[in-house]
Amino acid sequence: GLAYDISDDQQDITRGMVDSLFQAPMNDGTHYAVMSSYEYISQGLRVPLILGIWGGKMGINPIMMSAGELESGNAGEPAKMCCLFINDLDAGAGRVPIIVTGNDFSTLYAPLIRIGVCTGIFRLVDTFPGQSIDFFGALR
């Protein structure tokens, strides 16, 4: 029955299989990944901080924070690990603006800033001004 459903709760709600207030039993369904992080924390293991962007039905809200909050207070120590988790990116990327700021993106991934790497992207944007992200994603 639905009480033992281990599929994605959000998908079941979308398909009308369950009421929007339905939550699977503990350790099942979508919320398992969030709840299971307690198992790591309780054992004193170091795990990345996971920031999730989810719908309100899971009771998890996005957290706005500065990268400075992840830095160590002691010079030379590594920063805290973190992960940005976006659920169902393919459905939301064309509807949600993604804004990234930074001082030196070469520290993130050097090949992205090599001369000539993004010229094709800029050429497409110049050729089709004012188009949404979905438009460029559909180009082949």
Swiss-Prot record:
The keyword Chloroplast applies. Keywords: ATP-binding, Chloroplast, Nucleotide-binding, Plastid, Stress response. Gene3D superfamilies: 1.10.8.1070. Induction: By water stress. It is found in: Plastid, Chloroplast stroma. It comes from the Eukaryota. GO terms for cellular component: chloroplast stroma; thylakoid. InterPro entries: RCA-like (IPR044960). Belongs to the RuBisCO activase family. Activation of RuBisCO (ribulose-1,5-bisphosphate carboxylase/oxygenase; EC 4.1.1.39) involves the ATP-dependent carboxylation of the epsilon-amino group of lysine leading to a carbamate structure. This is Ribulose bisphosphate carboxylase/oxygenase activase, chloroplastic.
